[in-house]
Amino acid sequence: ENDVCASDNVIKRNQVMVGYSRDGYSWFREDMNPFHAVNTTTPDAWNQGNLQSVAGAPLIVGDKLYFYLSGRRLRGTQEITTTGLAMLRRDGFASMKGTGELQTSLLKFDGSHFFVNADVTGEMKVELLDSGNKVIEGFSKDECKAFKGDNVKARIEWTGNASLASLKDKQLKVKFYIDNGEIFAFWISPS
């Protein structure tokens, strides 16, 4: 209630949340934790009472996403407004993290090169499967060149197969084998 905030001499809490839509009409917010939260523990913090996104979308700057925010707090009866900048790795909104296997549903490829956005301290290998879950010859986990590192655009390759062009328009599944890592995104690109 605004009356409660006024009696406590604080600005009504407002935090930045993230939602998603696959069609632009129906929106979902799976995680109710704030994407950018107010700071209620530090006296006179720039974002102590109210936090809002300045723009509807982040700026893409190299491999990072920049989110400009406006923060507000009260000093006595005076409202102080400041600007903040939050940064996130590109496609870093969600990830699968840990050790194990991850398999997609059927996908249709239209490209030649396979890329991942991942941070892997162990190693990651990828294999391609047909609709019956059989490994496609030349694209097995054993033929995959292991990826290790932190890269938003790491190319995955298989020994003897530099291109996925032979798989164009086929329905396939991707299976990831991850040892101590985090995968944020993957995609197939023409170049």
Descriptions of predicted regions:
Residues 1-191:
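Carbohydrate-active catalytic/glycan-binding domains of CAZyme proteins
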